[in-house]
Amino acid sequence: MEVWAILEDLRQTRLLLENASDGVSGLWRFWFGGDLARLVFRIKQDYREEFEKLLDDIPGLFEALNLGHQAHFKEKVLSVLDFSTPGRTAAAVAFLTFILDKWIRQTHFSKGYVLDFIAAALWRTWKARRMRTILDYWPVQPLGVAGILRHPPTMPAVLQEEQQEDNPRAGLDPPVEE
């Protein structure tokens, strides 16, 4: 549950990725990183081989990222992340931290840019999935809210008359027989 609360804030998401990455010493991670950063780092270490296999299935990912193309990353990586449970969410964060570490070693971009890019992508994906989950439960909202959604707001008759174009011939043409 804590991982979901951290993903709600972009700054905390960035800090989590930074503290779980290889760019931070173990001593810093132990004293200042927090329990979740240590957990994500541990998941990343334990599943390194599986993460490597997953990245082998996505050829050209780092080349596209180095050229500034984000669509491949969004389509192949972000779209398949699973946030259904806190454990799967921690594994998704660990996978993105693994990508972060690997990309930093082979890019011309600064570490801060790469970290900001991955943190923002993770945060946006989390927010979009969370909003989709909330909207999936929309029919069980209180009756007042459901009634508002079923009946779109109507404009007062005075405003509707003002917006209608004046057509002096309206209704004067004889019906056309075909």
Curated annotation (Swiss-Prot):
It comes from the Viruses. PROSITE patterns: BCL2_FAMILY. Changing residue 58 to S: In strain: Grider. Its main location: host cell. The keyword Membrane applies. GO terms for cellular component: host cell nuclear lamina; host cell plasma membrane; membrane. InterPro entries: Adenovir_t-Ag_E1B_19kDa, Bcl2-like. Keywords: Apoptosis, Early protein, Host cell membrane, Host membrane, Host nucleus, Host-virus interaction, Inhibition of host apoptosis by viral BCL2-like protein, Membrane, Modulation of host cell apoptosis by virus. It is found in: Host cell membrane; Host nucleus envelope; Host nucleus lamina. GO terms for biological process: symbiont-mediated suppression of host apoptosis. Belongs to the adenoviridae E1B 19 kDa protein family. Putative adenovirus Bcl-2 homolog that inhibits apoptosis induced by TNF or FAS pathways, as well as p53-mediated apoptosis. Without E1B 19K function, virus production is compromised because of premature death of host cell. Interacts with Bax protein in cell lysates. This is E1B protein, small T-antigen.
